[in-house]
Amino acid sequence: MPSGTIHTLIKYDGNKFNEYRDFKDYIKYDNIKNIIEPFCGTASISFKIWEEYGDKFNYYINDKNEDILKYFEFHKKTNLNEFIDQFNIDKRQYDTQDKITVLYNEWCIYKDTYKYIILKKLTYMSLKMLRRDIKDRREYQIWETKSKVNKHQMKFQEFLNSPNVFITNNDWKECYNKYKDDNANLIIFDPPYVKSNNTNYNEDCRGLNVYENLNDINKDKAQSYFILEDIEETKELFKEWNILGTYPKTYSRSRRTTVHIVYKNIT
């Protein structure tokens, strides 16, 4: 079981924090004014670009998951030190799982955003994917936490509060269609993987549904990049796209290693 320091808030699931390093050299920023993520998730890609280039670009981060957007809005205006302080608990003070569950319920009773952060950031989930509708809360055990604000969390808060960062909660197609006709736009697609069973994703964001109308996307003016797992289904769909390169990716929880392909449209 985990012990020691657990950094709450801004935990990049799936090694997203480091993944940008693996594909950033494939992305060209010539004449680009706007960075768009239709599936922003934790917005780590836009964040890493911002860390490197600052407010040189506008950043449009979009996700249909309302919890994520609430999380961003909460994170923008919260004193992180005070917030994290209230969750620093010593497991030894709670000698049964019942007591920890009661504590969890007290935290979550009024604050949906707190509930999301606690479930995602303060609990040990093993290899289970977190379900949106939690019925048996005892599945998720709160362990000893000695959390503290780290430099990435403070920097991410600065990113969210930049006047060049715009947050939206729309369907990915609506987001994409708004920006597809301008060659000053760089659109980075990092959608849920085809074989993902993570029910946190909306139904229309899972499976091959998300890759509809790809031939049209391939011909639009905006520069579009897809970061996708190397599987036969996506290779067939993207056979007319430019392949810029590949890189290995190891998932932090399962230690499963896969190959990812960076695709770019023919614009």
Positions of predicted regions on the chain:
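SAM-dependent nucleic-acid methyltransferase catalytic core
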Residues: 2-22, 80-188, 192-198
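Short catalytic/ligand-binding loop motif for oxyanion handling, primarily in non-cytosolic enzymes
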Residues: 44-47, 68-70, 125-128, 195-198, ...
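Short helix-loop-beta connector
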Residues: 28-34, 181-183
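Active-site flanking residues adjacent to catalytic metal/cofactor-binding acidic residues
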Residues: 36, 62, 170, 189, ...
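Long, positively charged, glycine-interspersed low-complexity recognition regions
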Residues: 201-267
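Conserved beta-strand segments of alpha/beta enzyme cores
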Residues: 58, 164-166, 242
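SAM cofactor-binding core of SAM-dependent methyltransferases
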Residues: 33-100
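Short, polar loop motifs at secondary-structure junctions
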Residues: 41-42, 151-155, 228-233
